[in-house]
Amino acid sequence: MLPQSFTERMQGLLGSEYEEFLASFEHEKYQALRLNPLKRDDMSVITEKVKQTFQLQQVPWAENGYYYTKEDQPGKHPWHEAGLYYIQEPSAMAPVTLLSPQPGERILDLCAAPGGKSTQITSAMEGEGLLVTNEIHPSRAKILSENVERMGIRNACVLNETPEHLADIFEEYFDRILVDAPCSGEGMFRKNEVACEEWSPENVQLCADRQDGILECAARMLVPGGRLVYSTCTFAPAENEGSISCFLAKHEEFEIVPIDKKELGIPEGCDGIPACVENPAPGITGTLRLWPHKLRGEGHYAAVLQKKGELPEGYQPVSATGSEKGIPAKNLTKDWAEYFNFAKETFLEEQTIKAGLCTAGEGFLAFGDNLYRMPERMPGVKGLKVLRPGLHLGTLKKNRFEPAHALALALRPEDVKHVWKLSVEEAAAYLKGQTFSAEGEKGWYLICVDDCSLGWGKLAGGIMKNHYPKGLRKG
């Protein structure tokens, strides 16, 4: 049952389209997945295989996004655990398309959990540059970190910070910022009954006030000439056109970049609505409203903002914490000799030397007994709540090195000397913790399904010991 004050407002907002909008709530929610191009250099073969396995149809506004049917259940296929795709609501893919991330940039996903948009950003970055992905709530930040790991991401730093603290540290630091703002969730009413039950006009205003503060912080962190994308999953004007208009009234250095809906494959009638707020910002019609009665997705709003000005030639932004140097090479070689022994025995050096996984030098960071490979141009992490400072390489255990699950998921078969290929049925057994009889050279093996890494195995005495994390095993 939709709240009365919500339906009254929507009737005034939509006019003659209201009945069509209301009827959309009777339709089952649309479901989609987004393929992860970080898993393979050439995605064509595996993409066709996924398309043949599931009944996929292209999401118009997302290059690697596809609708699937409820019967497909891609979340139960081993490909999901291999990070070959991320299951994501189709409308939620639009903001990152609008952000247009580029390889080598510094990008911030400020309100990032559960991680769908962060993983989409890194796909577009092709693993190059720095993504700082942040979530203020600890439990949700943990889920964000887990999804960054599952998707095999190397160039992300996962934080659990407030926007205010980040703004103090990263003044004019990022080339692009995504603010997928916490909101009243009206666009998710069809998908999530709890969002409907918890809704109130007071909560809408509370969310709008919070969004104003988040946007203020984001503005401080964006470089001149940088792009900021603001998005919500609500229909509330106060949180959409209202938040953007309020922000622009205080920030003449920002302007709206009109969204080309036709180029995105979005139907007519999805413009921002100036009449729904007092004192609308110039160009507010150039923002985007995704309506569930007009397209195959839930309700979303997005605005693209540009910060005026240009960076001086050769400009290198510096965080208040400086840059992270990590472990000096001489100490790294001495303290982490077991890791480099593992790397020499396991990696094909010519494939992994570019990623800096084989040789001692700047870029390695130790957190206790855990070793990480930091993203390029990593800021200093002192004073920050860090969940994942980069790619987790592994752990020292009683003078031996044990590789991390995250490392396996970030590798490709061509990166390592030993690969153990499983069928889909064998992969399902591996995910349950099953060991396998095997012959071959003893040591660590990258376990793969359809040439997508799934985890580690260690061969000794004719047995491939299963090193898939016990906490992730499927029964």
Give residue ranges: language-model regions.
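Conserved class I S-adenosyl-L-methionine
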Residues: 104-113
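Helix-to-beta-strand junctions that scaffold the AdoMet/dcAdoMet cofactor pocket
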Residues: 126, 222-224
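A short acidic, Gly/Pro-enriched loop at the edge of an enzyme's catalytic core
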Residues: 102-103, 165-178
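Polybasic, low-complexity RNA-engagement segments
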Residues: 1-13, 17-53, 298-301, 308-475
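Mobile active-site "lid"/loop adjacent to the S-adenosyl-L-methionine
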Residues: 139, 175-216, 233-240, 250, ...
